[in-house]
């Protein structure tokens, strides 16, 4: 009798263990499925818009925002979904106009601006929330950006002469661009509408340059001369994989 009771108890324990193990397996599988859901989506896109530019100068130069254009192509690969967050990597190649416009406060109507033309390569993490197929997604982008200055132009208006300007900022007029390679950090947020005909989006970005366009040694005229840009972009993308 005692032996049968022991075997019965062991059987009950084994059944409880198996049931518990199966339950834990289902729970773990369900949690993992909710936490990490693989995706394999490749999209190409185009975008363009407006840049509002200024330069971070030391010593300071009084400025207005200089308008410029931006436009380019993108490649986005979506790899997985964590909870409700869709994770992707995005590579872009863009043309962008940067630079600055000096703010003359002497009431004469004189002006000076300098436009810098760049080919830019942002390497972005793209995180989004919302509908994956049909509907609205909200997203953020962020990462490093590299650029190459391919040309620049200056525009003088009015009767003033560079030698009449304050001594601290006079060297900027006609000064050659020393560093054509630019790098910095870019971040943005936007809304994307996913439709059967493709995806339409609008995005705002801010770029903070970490490199200087002029030499910045102790004997040079400027200790800092870095790009800063606010961008507004409209775009369209389609899935190719």
Specify the residue positions occupied by each region the protein language model found.
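Bacterial Sec-dependent N-terminal signal peptides
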Residues: 1-39, 234, 238-241
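Short glycine/proline- and aromatic-enriched beta-strand/turn motifs that initiate or cap beta-hairpins
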Residues: 33-76, 239-241
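Short loop/turn motifs that connect adjacent beta-strands in outer-membrane beta-barrel proteins
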Residues: 34-41, 80-87, 130-137, 194-199, ...
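Predominantly the C-terminal beta-signal and adjacent terminal strand-loop region
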Residues: 35, 39, 182, 187-241
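Residues that define the transmembrane beta-barrel architecture of outer-membrane proteins
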Residues: 40-42, 65-71, 115-121, 136, ...
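Residues on the lipid-exposed face of transmembrane beta-strands in outer-membrane beta-barrel proteins
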Residues: 46-50, 71-77, 95, 121-127, ...
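Structural signature of outer-membrane beta-barrel domains
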Residues: 51-55, 96-100, 145-151, 207-211, ...
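Flexible, solvent-exposed loop segments that connect beta-strands
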Residues: 55-62, 97-117, 150-181, 213-230
């Amino acid at each position: 009798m005692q032996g049968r009771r022991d075997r019965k108890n062991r059987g009950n324990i084994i059944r409880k263990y198996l049931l518990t193990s199966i339950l834990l397996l289902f729970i773990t599988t369900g949690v993992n499925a909710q936490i990490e859901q693989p995706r394999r989506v490749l999209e190409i896109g185009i975008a363009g818009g407006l840049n509002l530019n200024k330069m971070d100068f030391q010593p300071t130069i009084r400025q207005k925002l200089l308008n410029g254009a931006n436009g380019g192509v993108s490649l986005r690969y979506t790899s997985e979904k964590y909870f409700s967050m869709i994770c992707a990597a995005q590579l872009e190649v863009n043309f962008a106009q940067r630079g600055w416009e000096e703010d003359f406060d002497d009431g004469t109507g004189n002006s000076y601006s300098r436009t810098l033309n760049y080919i830019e390569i942002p390497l972005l993490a793209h995180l989004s929330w919302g509908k994956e197929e049909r509907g609205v997604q909200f997203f953020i982008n962020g990462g490093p950006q590299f650029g190459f200055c391919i040309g620049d132009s200056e525009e003088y208006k009015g009767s003033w002469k560079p030698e009449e300007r304050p001594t601290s900022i006079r060297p900027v007029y006609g000064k050659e661009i020393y560093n054509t390679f630019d790098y910095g950090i870019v971040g943005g947020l936007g809304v994307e509408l996913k439709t059967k005909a493709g995806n339409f989006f609008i995005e705002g970005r801010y770029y903070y340059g970490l490199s200087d366009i002029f030499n910045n040694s102790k004997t040079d005229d400027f200790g800092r001369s870095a790009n800063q840009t606010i961008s507004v972009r409209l775009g369209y993308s389609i899935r190719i994989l």
